[in-house]
Amino acid sequence: RPYQNPAVMATRNKTSKYSLRDNPTGIYAKADETLAVFVGDIYEGGKVSMLIQDLNGGYNNSKTYELSEGYNEITVEVGGLIYILNHVNDDIPLRLEDADNDQKRNIEAKTVKVHFANGKVNGYFDIQKNKESDWAQIRDNAKYQEIDVLGEYSHLTWRISDFKKYNTEITKTIENLDRL
């Protein structure tokens, strides 16, 4: 689905923009791997891209690839977690339930379907879809070193080994982060 570009609110609030990684896929790739990515209809004027983030080299160690409708074959230069970027300058709230009918129609019109024919499944936790009882299975099945955890307002990417070591209560953790 589309998300409002963080630069819009950053300009309005006179702050810096933060993460553009609003659409985690739960997929990861290794460097030099070739991915087959199918993309549905892209709305007029839309730009959809795939970002691969390797936190081993720091937050700025990422590579973005523009996607086009149909079949995309991409040999990735950087391995890591994969995100789909679909940013708009429209007035779209972060939470779908906060959208009015016009905003919901706009979100629906600018949602682009993306399918990975290959790639490795890592999974992610989304507090709006998952429960605490799902967490152990999601965490234990993750194959990459980090995993994405989505709250209602927050997005955390952290090392799986730390979540396991400290037996993290994930819903409590992300709810606390949402309240910040």
Where are these regions (language model features)?
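Catalytic cores of extracellular degradative/oxidative enzymes
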Residues: 135-180
